[in-house]
């Protein structure tokens, strides 16, 4: 299995909006390669007959009835917002950010 | 934006190329609460009054699935002839955009709850086209952005944006077709008919009102062209948020013409999202589509799998209502009308009012006559939908009953309907207030007939001489004298009787 390349780490960093220095790209490429290698070894053992685990608890169908519960007040909802206006979360210009 | 787009004529485009479409429809469910938390979904609330730690994406908040949301998804899947997954999971679709405070949308990726179905749609001429369904999956809606500083709330030129997360987390079902091939020049019509049929279906299932003008149902039109005789699909464009039936058809048509212009001049189509403009019927370039893997989907760790038991699925299946196409065909036969007549009824939004009027005791022909006649006209004039008019099917049925009993003629009935629409009360109240009763008092009628004959001796002579058609003038005189409140057929009988002629 070929490992993760430096270019792939740079791409992931961009998707995750992380600004990485060249030496950090090198560093994380090595680390991620180790992690992926470890996961790949698990995949070798787990065949088609082993169902994928998405949760440590063997539960399915945890649902709630369609009943309205109290919401936060707008003051509470906005209390952590760095900026607000007209009872809304204020965010910088959306397009042209890249 | 004033950029012009090169187009070739629709006919020329179809002469060289074969369109392939994929339609993605998002339906906002009509549940009381959001998909993963108990916040209300009621419309029209003040901004950010229907949010909680879950739908705001606060650290540590845990989502729990709305049982009605899952049931609605299964209902939709079954009505679309899909298989229902025995086991499926939610997935995180990661992206950074302020409309989702979590920085991901909880959706389904490779394990949709419903898959491999179809929907039969009827085109205007009655031909049926089968659209194959790839999948229907559960996800959540995003918040609403308000762009400030640009022209008329547009994103371009905005200095900043304001977010209201009341809508974030409202359950959505995304229904995706398989590539629609073989529709040829009728592709735009198929697209429209499909979305319309889907809307009827969603409404019949009672899972959403599916009002496109309110964003409860939104359509993305994927379209590509390939030269005739080739199998391989061309590069597609994805026109987002096309929000009326007419726009779906126009967007598909425009993209066919645009793609053909690009391809026939030797260019290549860029895989991108495009925006549809209602005013011009055109599309403009949006962002270049991110590849699916850029969303870095992975199974949602905060939710456990959904594994609908077969018993539950069969219970839901057995409770499905009669589906719209089946119902329409049954009613068409019961009423003895043509496919075109039924299409007009559908286009006018008159099907449900007519059925309700028949249920309230009217015969089918009268119910159709009033809803497609006087009421359709009135709705048109006031720019309202039929079901928004200030008259109920029960009231229309009462008017029809008064006509059947001979207490009203059509002309008076029309006045009664106008009275009800004007808020003058029930049909019976309008009859009383406006004094609208057919004059059935034979004495009064006979007197009016005698008067009309005496006042028009020339006409009377013609009738005596066998020109029965001339009786119309005398009927008119009697109707005028009785202010339209006589039964015209009876008046004619009386005139002919008096003048000693028989009709023939």
Swiss-Prot record, chain A:
Nucleotide-binding keyword on record: yes
MF GO annotations: asparaginyl-tRNA synthase (glutamine-hydrolyzing) activity; ATP binding; glutaminyl-tRNA synthase (glutamine-hydrolyzing) activity
Start and end residues of each stretch annotated as Disordered: 47-98
Gene Ontology terms describing biological process: glutaminyl-tRNAGln biosynthesis via transamidation; regulation of translational fidelity; translation
E.C. designation(s): 6.3.5.-
Catalysis performed (reactions): L-glutamyl-tRNA(Gln) + L-glutamine + ATP + H2O = L-glutaminyl-tRNA(Gln) + L-glutamate + ADP + phosphate + H(+); L-aspartyl-tRNA(Asn) + L-glutamine + ATP + H2O = L-asparaginyl-tRNA(Asn) + L-glutamate + ADP + phosphate + 2 H(+)
Top EC group: ligase
Protein keywords: ATP-binding, Ligase, Nucleotide-binding, Protein biosynthesis
PANTHER family: GLUTAMYL-TRNA(GLN) AMIDOTRANSFERASE SUBUNIT C, MITOCHONDRIAL
Role according to the record: Allows the formation of correctly charged Asn-tRNA(Asn) or Gln-tRNA(Gln) through the transamidation of misacylated Asp-tRNA(Asn) or Glu-tRNA(Gln) in organisms which lack either or both of asparaginyl-tRNA or glutaminyl-tRNA synthetases. The reaction takes place in the presence of glutamine and ATP through an activated phospho-Asp-tRNA(Asn) or phospho-Glu-tRNA(Gln).
Family the UniProt entry places it in: Belongs to the GatC family.
UniProt-listed NCBIfam families: gatC
Protein's recorded name: Glutamyl-tRNA(Gln) amidotransferase subunit C
Organism field: Streptomyces coelicolor (strain ATCC BAA-471 / A3(2) / M145)
Lineage, broadest ranks: Bacteria, Bacillati, Actinomycetota, Actinomycetes, Kitasatosporales
């Amino acid at each position: 299995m070929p490992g993760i390349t430096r270019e792939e780490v740079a791409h992931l960093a961009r998707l995750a909006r992380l600004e990485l220095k060249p030496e950090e790209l090198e560093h994380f490429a090595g680390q991620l390669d180790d992690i992926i290698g470890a996961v790949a070894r698990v995949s070798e053992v787990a065949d088609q007959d082993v169902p994928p685990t998405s949760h440590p608890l063997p539960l399915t169908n945890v649902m709630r009835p369609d009943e309205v519960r109290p919401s936060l007040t707008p003051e509470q909802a906005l209390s952590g917002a760095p900026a607000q206006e007209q009872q809304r979360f204020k965010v910088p210009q959306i397009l042209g950010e890249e | 934006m004033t950029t012009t787009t090169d187009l070739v004529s629709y006919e020329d485009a179809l002469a060289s190329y074969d369109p392939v479409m994929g339609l993605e429809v998002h339906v906002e469910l009509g549940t009381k609460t959001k998909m993963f938390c108990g916040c209300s979904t009621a419309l029209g609330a003040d901004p950010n009054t229907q949010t909680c730690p879950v739908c705001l994406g606060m650290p540590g908040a845990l989502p729990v699935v709305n049982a009605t949301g899952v049931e609605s998804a299964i209902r939709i899947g079954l009505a679309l002839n899909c298989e229902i997954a025995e086991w499926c999971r939610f997935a995180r679709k990661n992206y950074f955009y302020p409309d989702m405070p979590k920085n991901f949308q909880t959706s389904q990726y490779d394990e949709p709850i419903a898959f491999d179905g179809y929907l039969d749609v009827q085109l205007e001429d009655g031909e049926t086209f089968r659209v194959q369904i790839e999948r229907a999956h559960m996800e959540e809606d995003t918040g609403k952005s308000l762009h400030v500083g640009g022209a008329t709330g547009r994103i371009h030129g905005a200095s900043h944006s304001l977010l209201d997360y009341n809508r974030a987390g409202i359950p959505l079902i995304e229904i995706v077709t398989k590539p629609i091939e073989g529709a040829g020049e009728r592709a735009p019509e198929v697209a429209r008919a499909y979305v319309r049929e889907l809307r009827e279906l969603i409404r019949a299932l009672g899972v959403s009102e599916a009002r496109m003008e309110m964003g409860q149902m939104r359509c993305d039109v994927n379209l590509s062209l390939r030269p005739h005789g080739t199998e391989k699909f061309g590069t597609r464009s994805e026109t987002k948020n096309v929000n009326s039936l007419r726009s779906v058809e126009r967007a598909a048509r425009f993209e066919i013409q645009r793609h053909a212009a690009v391809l026939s001049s030797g260019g290549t189509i860029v895989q991108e999202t495009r925006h549809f403009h209602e005013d011009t019927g055109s599309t403009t370039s949006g962002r270049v589509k991110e590849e699916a893997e850029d969303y870095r989907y992975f199974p949602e760790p905060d939710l456990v799998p959904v594994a609908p038991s077969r018993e539950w699925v069969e219970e839901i299946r057995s409770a499905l209502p009669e589906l719209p196409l089946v119902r329409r065909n049954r009613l068409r036969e019961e009423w003895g009308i043509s496919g075109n007549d039924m299409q007009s009824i559908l286009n006018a939004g008159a099907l449900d009012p007519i059925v309700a009027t028949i249920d309230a005791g009217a015969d089918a022909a009268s119910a159709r006559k009033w809803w497609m006649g006087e009421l359709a006209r009135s709705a048109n004039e006031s720019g309202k939908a039929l079901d928004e008019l200030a008259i109920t099917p029960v009231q229309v049925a009462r008017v029809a009953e008064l006509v059947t009993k001979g207490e009203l003629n059509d002309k008076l009935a029309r006045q009664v309907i106008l009275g009800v629409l004007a808020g003058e009360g029930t049909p019976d109240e309008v009859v009383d207030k406006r004094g609208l009763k057919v004059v059935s008092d034979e004495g009064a009628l006979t007197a009016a007939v005698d008067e009309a004959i005496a006042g028009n001796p020339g006409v009377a002579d013609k009738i005596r001489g066998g020109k029965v058609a001339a009786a119309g003038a005398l009927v008119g005189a009697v109707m005028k004298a009785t202010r339209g409140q006589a039964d015209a057929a009876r008046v004619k009988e009386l005139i002919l009787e008096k003048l000693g002629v028989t009709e023939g």
